[in-house]
């Protein structure tokens, strides 16, 4: 029988509640599928049970202490093996979530997870953000991305997906302030503003800084540009 994770106290300590039995069962099944399929798809270098639950599952949820996502239409950009999108769907089943990634193997994996966990109102798409954003312009209430790209790059890739007054949530590491400094005021060009910054101390899985933006106006037609051009002009040093 598969070993079941039992250190649910880390969720209570960091989120203020213990997951329901249904959520626990789905997370345990998700972990089992992740480890099994990782042998084929090379999804994550982190496979130890304790580490996956803390560094992937819990980390995917910490931002929810700062904003509500209930009943929101969400896009997870560069979702990889489903962080944070699958985790959010398990905890907040009433959300409507689209997962996108340019790696088709990861999309295949996500479809396995969605089917086995019987998740509803969630879709995995093999797509590039800069191309899909032109098609799905101003469609989402929330766009979210976890450790995908340098700040000015992900801002440009994500902003067109959002409705006006929609939220962009970026789950970052300890260098977020440096990325803001080097972003060349791209947020002003994109008509989006930083409204909140959540700083999380290192409690065993690294210092985290989560950034919250709000879209003020429609995205100028220029953006997003081709990916190569975005990266070439990035403020990353």
From Swiss-Prot:
Signal peptide: none annotated. Its main location: cytoplasm. Keywords: Cytoplasm, Methyltransferase, rRNA processing, S-adenosyl-L-methionine, Transferase. The keyword Flavoprotein does not apply. Its EC number is 2.1.1.-. InterPro entries: rRNA_ssu_MeTfrase_G (IPR003682), SAM-dependent_MTases_sf (IPR029063). This is Ribosomal RNA small subunit methyltransferase G. It is found in: Cytoplasm. Pfam families: GidB (PF02527). One of its GO terms (molecular function) is rRNA (guanine-N7-)-methyltransferase activity. Belongs to the methyltransferase superfamily. RNA methyltransferase RsmG family. CDD domains: AdoMet_MTases (cd02440). One of its GO terms (cellular component) is cytosol. Specifically methylates the N7 position of a guanine in 16S rRNA. S-adenosyl-L-methionine binds at residues 78, 83, 129-130, 146.
């Amino acid at each position: 029988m598969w070993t079941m994770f039992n250190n649910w106290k880390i969720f209570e300590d960091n989120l203020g509640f213990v997951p329901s039995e249904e959520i626990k069962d789905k997370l345990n099944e998700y972990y089992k599928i992740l480890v099994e399929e990782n042998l084929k798809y090379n999804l994550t270098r982190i496979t130890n049970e304790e580490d996956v639950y803390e560094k992937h599952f819990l980390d995917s949820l910490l931002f929810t202490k700062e904003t509500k996502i209930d009943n929101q239409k969400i896009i997870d950009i560069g979702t990889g093996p489903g962080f944070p999108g699958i985790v959010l769907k398990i905890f907040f089943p009433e959300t409507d979530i689209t997962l996108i990634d340019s790696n088709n193997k990861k999309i295949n994996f996500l479809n396995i997870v969605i089917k086995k966990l019987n998740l509803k109102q969630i879709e995995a798409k093999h797509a590039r953000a800069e191309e899909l954003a032109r098609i799905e312009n101003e469609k989402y209430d929330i766009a979210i991305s976890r450790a995908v790209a340098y700040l000015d790059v992900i801002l440009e890739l994500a902003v067109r997906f959002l409705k006006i007054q929609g939220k962009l949530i970026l789950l970052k590491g300890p260098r977020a302030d440096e990325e803001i400094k080097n972003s060349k005021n791209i947020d002003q060009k994109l008509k989006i503003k930083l409204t909140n910054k959540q700083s999380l101390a290192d409690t065993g899985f690294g210092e985290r800084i989560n950034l919250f933006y709000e879209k003020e106006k429609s995205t100028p037609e220029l953006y997003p540009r081709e990916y190569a051009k975005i990266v070439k002009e990035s403020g990353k040093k």
